[in-house]
Amino acid sequence: MEKHSGFVRFITRGSLVGQILVGLVLGIALASFSQSGAIAAGLLGTLFVSALKAVAPVLVFILVAASIANHRQGQKTNMRPIVLLYLLGTFAAALVAVVVSFAFPSQLALVSHTNDITPPGGIVEVLQSLLMNVVDNPFHALASGNFIGILAWAIGLGVALRHASDTTKRVVGDLSYGVTFIVRVVIRFAPLGIFGLVSSTLAETGFDALWGYAHLLMVLIGAMLLVALVLNPLIVFWKIRRNPYPLVFTCLRESGLTAFFTRSSAANIPVNMELCKKLGLNEDTYAVSIPLGATINMAGAAITITVLTLAAAHTLEISVDLPTALLLSLVAAVCACGASGVAGGSLLLIPLACSLFGISSDIAMQVVAVGFIIGVLQDSCETALNSSTDVLFTATACVAAEESTGDSAAELG
């Protein structure tokens, strides 16, 4: 009985990363020894993707509305430079992801037919489609998975509810918690879903699919390394006009390393607070900027959304021009700012970006499933970049402000 309880505890409370790794290995093993069994196991993957597809629209709608409705005003802190750095870093990371994706295009193993796709003719058609999706009926948007329409209605409802009573705001917040709990339950089935997806994909397409995922993972991690070691130091140097690398490496070592294993920006907040204190930063500033950064500073998420979306477009042979790629960078940056509240991280926001290219929700959720397969490393690297950048930009803004007023600057490393 104790063994049974221990097994149940491992399933419900054990490391999701470890369970996904087990599912990944078992899926490969099943595909190697039994093609028919692997294809049959694909039902588990189909159910998992369908569950994600069902819950994602409701999650985005409730989460965004609750976040805006419960936003607090009147916080008196010198936050503008830090917020600007957060937004600049996230958008610039999306641009880096676009460049890397064009330089090293990735192919995904998707079960789809290109003939079913109606790609946009260019930026004008994309913008026209975008505007039409914005004014979609909210119920139709939820039912059809029109994430742009869902966002528009969620923002509108959230702004309206900011003037509601505290009781109403609490109800909306409770709804957000309830939906997030359901998503967490769905995510707990990720190992089974990954097992089915990997086994059926390998059985139907062969082991070449693994190389496709390996290439995609290399593109993702390569873009994140470029941002961490090149782009972010350039931004820091632009602000403080001195060698940025002591601070960059300190943040990566003391914040990024723990975030890599916790895979949670929120869980890494105490680590970042302690690092800010160690660096001698203004407590009134970092007490606000670090929790805020865990919510809106999402360079890693912007990279994930951009790379996977462009990989899907490349796989479906959809031509992407430069203006559309720039629009994707902007959309990815905006989506990334909301990724922290999503239990699946940035992956569940990929369908929104995919909709820019006329990619159906069915195929977009297959891309999300690919993200879960590579998520063991992708999510860890993404969180490490996101969380370490919170401290990096907070320290940068504090040092720049202190130097502009002639005060003694904080210790950089």
UniProtKB/Swiss-Prot annotation:
Which Pfam families does the entry mention?
A: SDF
How does the protein associate with the membrane?
Multi-pass membrane protein
What InterPro entries does UniProt report for this protein, alphabetically?
Na-dicarboxylate_symporter, Na:dicarbo_symporter_sf, Ser_Thr_transp_SstT
Membrane-spanning residues where?
Answer: 14-34, 44-64, 82-102, 141-161, 178-198, 217-237, 290-310, 330-350, 356-376
Gene Ontology cellular component?
plasma membrane
Q: Would you kindly state one Gene Ontology biological process term found in this protein's UniProt entry?
A: threonine transport
Recall the GO molecular function terms of this protein's record.
neutral L-amino acid:sodium symporter activity
Record's catalysed reaction(s): L-serine(in) + Na(+)(in) = L-serine(out) + Na(+)(out); L-threonine(in) + Na(+)(in) = L-threonine(out) + Na(+)(out)
Q: Where in the cell is it found?
A: Cell inner membrane
| Keyword annotations of the record | Amino-acid transport, Cell inner membrane, Cell membrane, Membrane, Symport, Transmembrane, Transmembrane helix, Transport
Q: Which Gene3D superfamilies match?
A: Sodium:dicarboxylate symporter
PANTHER family (UniProt xref): PROTON/GLUTAMATE-ASPARTATE SYMPORTER, SERINE_THREONINE TRANSPORTER SSTT
What this protein is reported to do is described as: Involved in the import of serine and threonine into the cell, with the concomitant import of sodium (symport system).
> What HAMAP family does the record point to?
Ser_Thr_transp_SstT (MF_01582)
What's the family? Answer: Belongs to the dicarboxylate/amino acid:cation symporter (DAACS) (TC 2.A.23) family.
List the NCBIfam families hit by this protein, alphabetically: PRK13628.1
Q: What is this protein called?
A: Serine/threonine transporter SstT
Per the UniProt entry, what species is this protein from, by scientific name?
Edwardsiella ictaluri (strain 93-146)
Gene symbol here is sstT
